[in-house]
Amino acid sequence: MWFKNLKLYHLTQTLDLTEEDIQDKLAEFPFRPCGSQELATMGWTSPVGQGDMLVHSAGGKFWLTLKKQERILPAAVVNAELADKVALMEAETGSNVGKKAQQEMKEEIIQRLLPQAFTKNSFSHGFISTQDNLVVVDASADGKAETFLAMLRKAIGSLPVVPLAKQSVQEELTHWLTDDSVPNDVVILEEAELRSMEEDGAIVRCKNQDLGSEEIANHLSAGKTVQKIAIEWDETFSALLQEDMAVKRLKFTDVMTEQNDDIPKEDKLAKMDADFALMSAEIVRFSKRLVEIFNLQQDQE
């Protein structure tokens, strides 16, 4: 349940929605399994993995889960069967099979094999904090986050969001190393990516490296800027913070993840609820801290 990545978005307009409102809207787009001739389907499912509720509320945050099912039909399987059919037809007719005919044959093979193909399920989690004008998606790639937002926008009708950081904060991240201006609640770890500002410039990726070393200082003096940097924040989690404010490899500390261990293991729903309330509150607190640290403009229409 603990998020592994963060894509942070600012709501430019207040969303006046209750848990019941969101439930009703998501219920119009529920997940359903792939039909026999469908490559993929997508829809909303229970965040806690049981029951009919498509939204879980805790501490004023609404937890949502998008489920995708795909049929796994390897291209190699299709192409191998296509090659056999083309070879057989050419042997029988003595002439080459044209591209159009091959495409039609390929589509016929896909339609025949699809119902037999295995399916794979994947899940995208996120939450809305209307009181904080914040939307958070657990995604490492922009495409996955944008799909989540697009499906949410389709369901609720309007989702006026912009990235938390509208422009790169690479200069500020670089100053953390060049000017020793690291915020008090941030600890710099031993991983970073530095990039030259020149077109097709050099990229330096370092791991298990003292970022205060002379070697790193030389790269910075040569004009490279920080694109990604590993941090620990306020004894709450470690992560890789990017210049666009995306957060990857998020790992909450044991102190955090063990806070609710007093809840009986058999009461899984209560444990999930408590963990989500704790995690989402810390993510909101972190996002507010990012706004302060980088002086991000949070316009409201």
UniProtKB/Swiss-Prot annotation:
| Top-level taxonomic group | Bacteria
Give the species: Pseudoalteromonas atlantica (strain T6c / ATCC BAA-1087)
What is the role of this chain? Answer: May be involved in recombination.
**Similarity remark:** Belongs to the RdgC family.
Keyword list, A-Z = Cytoplasm, DNA recombination
Any single GO CC term annotated in Swiss-Prot or TrEMBL for this entry: bacterial nucleoid
Q: Where in the cell is it found?
A: Cytoplasm, Nucleoid
* GO terms, molecular function: double-stranded DNA binding
Keyword Cytoplasm attributed:
yes
Q: What protein name is recorded for this chain?
A: Recombination-associated protein RdgC
